[in-house]
From Swiss-Prot:
Gene3D superfamilies: 3.30.230.10, GHMP kinase, C-terminal domain (3.30.70.890)
Name of the top EC class for this enzyme: transferase
Taxonomic lineage: Bacteria, Pseudomonadati, Pseudomonadota, Gammaproteobacteria, Alteromonadales
EC identifiers of the protein: 2.7.1.148
Catalytic residues of the enzyme: 22, 147
Associated pathway: Isoprenoid biosynthesis; isopentenyl diphosphate biosynthesis via DXP pathway; isopentenyl diphosphate from 1-deoxy-D-xylulose 5-phosphate: step 3/6
Gene designation: ispE
Descriptive protein name: 4-diphosphocytidyl-2-C-methyl-D-erythritol kinase
GO biological process: isopentenyl diphosphate biosynthetic process, methylerythritol 4-phosphate pathway; terpenoid biosynthetic process
SUPFAM superfamilies to which the protein is assigned, alphabetical: GHMP Kinase, C-terminal domain, Ribosomal protein S5 domain 2-like
The keyword Nucleotide-binding appears for this protein: yes
Reactions the enzyme catalyzes: 4-CDP-2-C-methyl-D-erythritol + ATP = 4-CDP-2-C-methyl-D-erythritol 2-phosphate + ADP + H(+)
Originating species: Colwellia psychrerythraea (strain 34H / ATCC BAA-681) (Vibrio psychroerythus)
The family this protein is said to belong to: Belongs to the GHMP kinase family. IspE subfamily.
Length: 300
């Protein structure tokens, strides 16, 4: 596929795109594949807390990241990898300048890097006028990371396989206090650990007929291992569950605590122990990126 460059109204315009966080309301590991990847059953929900990517499509072919992230080589940055991947698959002659306002923590389990990659793929598909389908973009995204497809599809979903088989589900859009202790956790470290649970029984489909998934019927298989290895996470979780239902997201280190109102979440935030970073956010069953893309598509 070759992207269109003639009469492209998006060229040389700086356009902002949200790159939202996600939480895993539960994460069950139901097996391990021969290729080393794990078969999961997890429920993704977005939250209204996002990085912001600014992209400017250019007539020159270069891919430029104007705001490098400390400690991450540009060649290893998922933002750059995603742009290069789409450029190679589309055979476009166009380029892009990208900057990021990064507010999502790294090593937190909120999917920030995967979200950044997905936003780049979806945004450049529009700005370069490549016309790949969401399914095609998801296949590209999966090569960058297992969480990338959910951010491309843009709806809350029950995910199976490595996280790429998605079924739309609408959990309640609760308010959450998102907390992070003073540590970061490597996803690879957790998923390669010998004592990680890998044989959780698959869910009966009827178990999904609810809107509240932060109950004892669901759990995060990574959490038990993480609290053994990271006392900071263990201490934080023990404190939070005294107030409201709390669970680690992804492989951590972030923990979400569920509330029915913004005021309740803010009230507990004010009581947090020192050294804990935090923010309050609402669950979203539709990614804010979808709305931005829809508006821009109408303006072409």
């Amino acid at each position: 596929m070759t992207c269109a460059s003639n009469s492209n109204s998006f060229l040389n315009k700086a356009i902002e795109f949200p790159s939202p966080a996600k939480i895993n309301l539960f994460l069950h590991i139901v097996g391990q594949r021969e290729d080393g990847y794990h078969n999961l059953e997890t429920l993704f929900q977005f939250i209204d807390h996002s990085d912001t990517l600014t992209l400017t499509a250019t007539e020159t072919p270069d891919i430029e990241l104007l705001t490098p992230i400390d400690g991450v080589n540009n060649d290893d940055n998922l933002i750059v990898k995603a742009a290069r991947l789409l450029k190679n698959r589309s055979n476009t002659d166009l380029g892009v300048k990208i900057s990021i306002n990064k507010i999502l923590p790294m090593g937190g389990g909120l999917g920030g890097g995967s979200s950044n990659a997905a936003t780049v793929l979806v945004a450049l598909n529009l700005l370069w006028q490549c016309e790949f389908s969401l399914s095609e973009l998801s296949s590209l995204g999966l090569s960058l990371g297992a969480d990338v497809p959910i951010f491309i599809h843009g709806f809350s979903a029950f995910a199976q396989g490595v996280g790429d088989h998605l079924t739309a589900i609408k959990p309640q859009e609760s308010w959450y206090l998102i907390t992070k202790p003073e540590c970061s956790i490597s996803t690879k470290e957790i998923f390669t650990a010998v004592d990680l649970p890998r044989n959780t029984k698959k869910l009966d489909p009827t178990a999904l007929n609810t809107s509240d998934f932060v109950t004892e019927s669901f759990h995060n298989d990574c959490q038990t291992l993480v609290i053994k290895q990271y006392p900071e996470v263990a201490k934080l979780l023990a404190w939070l569950v005294e107030y409201a239902p709390s669970r680690m997201t992804g492989t951590g280190a972030c923990v979400f605590t569920q509330f029915s109102s913004y005021q309740e979440a803010r009230s507990l935030q004010a009581k947090l122990p020192k050294g804990i970073s935090s923010f309050v956010a609402q669950g979203l069953n539709k990614s804010p990126l979808c709305s931005v893309i829809a508006k821009l598509s109408l303006s072409e």
